[in-house]
């Protein structure tokens, strides 16, 4: 199991950042590897809300497991999904800046030695996606790694 975290500082108020980040249908706007995310449950966003995610090479269903408005949102894949992952965003207000701690637990199904080798690449790719999130929220537009331009 890979475990890592990244931190990014976004020059926007916490409420604005949390609203965008906790709506997981926004992920394709800042993560080029995720093609689509759809909310499956009809309830308002909160603990228990489920989503279906389509990435370039696979698909997963996941559920919100922790939700504290303007502070924390965490998700975990449902049992039938692979790869298995848990992700937690923790936000704190620092004036008009919002630091986001992005914590991951990712089951790769690979031996520990191989996990260590790919771990740095995965962490780096996630960090790069977070810089795209920062740019999108601060500038209102971003060009993703695959050349797609997104505006909000």
Residue ranges and their predicted role:
Residues 1-41, 132, 138-139, 151-152:
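Hydrophobic ligand-binding cavity/cleft-lining segments
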Residues 6-8, 60-66, 77, 85-93:
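Hydrophobic/aromatic beta-strand elements that line small-molecule binding cavities or substrate pockets
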Residues 79-128, 133-135, 144-147:
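Beta-strand/loop substructures that line and gate deep hydrophobic ligand-binding cavities in soluble
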Residues 52, 61, 72-74, 99-101:
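General beta-strand recognition
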Residues 49-56, 73-80:
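Short beta-strand segments that buttress and anchor functional surface loops
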């Amino acid at each position: 199991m890979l475990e890592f975290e990244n931190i990014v500082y976004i020059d926007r108020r916490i409420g604005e950042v949390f609203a965008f980040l906790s709506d997981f249908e926004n992920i394709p706007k800042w993560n080029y590897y995720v093609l689509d995310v759809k909310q499956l449950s009809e309830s308002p966003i909160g603990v228990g809300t489920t989503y279906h995610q389509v990435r370039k090479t696979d698909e997963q269903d996941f559920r919100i497991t922790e939700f504290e408005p303007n502070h924390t949102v965490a998700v975990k894949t449902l049992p039938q999904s692979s790869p298995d992952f848990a992700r937690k965003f923790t936000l704190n207000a620092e004036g008009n800046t919002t630091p986001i701690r992005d914590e991951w637990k990712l089951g790769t199904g690979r031996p520990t030695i191989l996990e260590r080798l790919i771990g740095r690449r995965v962490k780096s790719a996630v960090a790069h996606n977070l810089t795209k999130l920062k740019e999108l929220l601060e500038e209102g537009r971003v060009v993703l790694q695959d050349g797609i331009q997104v505006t909000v």
